[in-house]
């Protein structure tokens, strides 16, 4: 198996491991947090493996410029791997893009419902989630046209539930739409990875099960106090996680964080994510942050094994988190809120 894998994918695996080794280390983050201006941030970044990514930039230093250039580098690395891949890795790489597409669609649906400028929103879309039909949003004037333009004849059409009410799409909370799409995405990606077998199946089903549980718990917590009935909540919970169906059914009925934690403790120990949460100073560490920390550890551990596609998935996840961290630090510097500058998500690469 290892010989077959190396013949087809050995170069891309080695390349991706090299990309990962070039990510920011603890000392790099320390240098960034000591910057006094966005100009300093850009100079510091160019002293890392990013190199002269701002070399051709004519705009004044801003968080938007920094984020765009960082995303462009992620885009270059992704498409280099994608363009040199063969099946089944090509399809696997497409699955990595789908969450970005879903987020872009959710952004545009929310914009349409709130009468925002579509041209401006299109510029805010993540480049990894762009697809040809996305431009059709600009001319959509109602939910029916939006549904036809984006949710039918597009790469993410396969994730649209049959019972999603098209006629009330304009009035649905965009997070509900996103949750339905993500559930279908995770379940189909899980099934695809399981079919691949070998180390890829072992690594990816573990990562996707965690992602499914994270989404379930987050949705359950966010639904507390809402008017979403248990039956509708349950429809948004992915079923490919470690949490069994009885846990999902139970959490769909709960309106108390402590009870959700108790259910998590009984089945998989996720309850520790809630420990001392209310005592974190100034809300610096949220439930989402704790899940991101756990996700970062899991994705770093993916590189301890060989001969599997999981490293491509984990690299994109880690790189996405790195961009998020740099943008957070840049925002704190731009807004002179340096007391919060260290509240980024540590990536244990050292």
Swiss-Prot record:
SUPFAM superfamilies: V-type ATP synthase subunit C. Belongs to the V-ATPase V0D/AC39 subunit family. It comes from the Eukaryota. InterPro entries: ATPase_csu/dsu_sf, ATPase_V0-cplx_csu/dsu, ATPase_V0-cplx_dsu, V-type_ATPase_csu/dsu, V-type_ATPase_csu/dsu_dom_3. This is Probable V-type proton ATPase subunit d 2. Subunit of the V0 complex of vacuolar(H+)-ATPase (V-ATPase), a multisubunit enzyme composed of a peripheral complex (V1) that hydrolyzes ATP and a membrane integral complex (V0) that translocates protons. V-ATPase is responsible for acidifying and maintaining the pH of intracellular compartments and in some cell types, is targeted to the plasma membrane, where it is responsible for acidifying the extracellular environment. May play a role in coupling of proton transport and ATP hydrolysis. GO terms for cellular component: early endosome; plasma membrane proton-transporting V-type ATPase complex; proton-transporting V-type ATPase complex; proton-transporting V-type ATPase, V0 domain; vacuolar proton-transporting V-type ATPase complex. Pfam families: vATP-synt_AC39. The keyword Metal-binding does not apply. Signal peptide: none annotated. It comes from Drosophila melanogaster (Fruit fly). Keywords: Hydrogen ion transport, Ion transport, Transport. Gene3D superfamilies: ATP synthase (C/AC39) subunit, domain 3, V-type ATP synthase subunit C domain. GO terms for molecular function: proton-transporting ATPase activity, rotational mechanism. V-ATPase is a heteromultimeric enzyme made up of two complexes: the ATP-hydrolytic V1 complex and the proton translocation V0 complex. The V1 complex consists of three catalytic AB heterodimers that form a heterohexamer, three peripheral stalks each consisting of EG heterodimers, one central rotor including subunits D and F, and the regulatory subunits C and H. The proton translocation complex V0 consists of the proton transport subunit a, a ring of proteolipid subunits c9c'', rotary subunit d, subunits e and f, and the accessory subunits VhaAC45 and ATP6AP2. The gene is VhaAC39-2. GO terms for biological process: proton transmembrane transport; terminal branching, open tracheal system; vacuolar acidification; vacuolar transport.
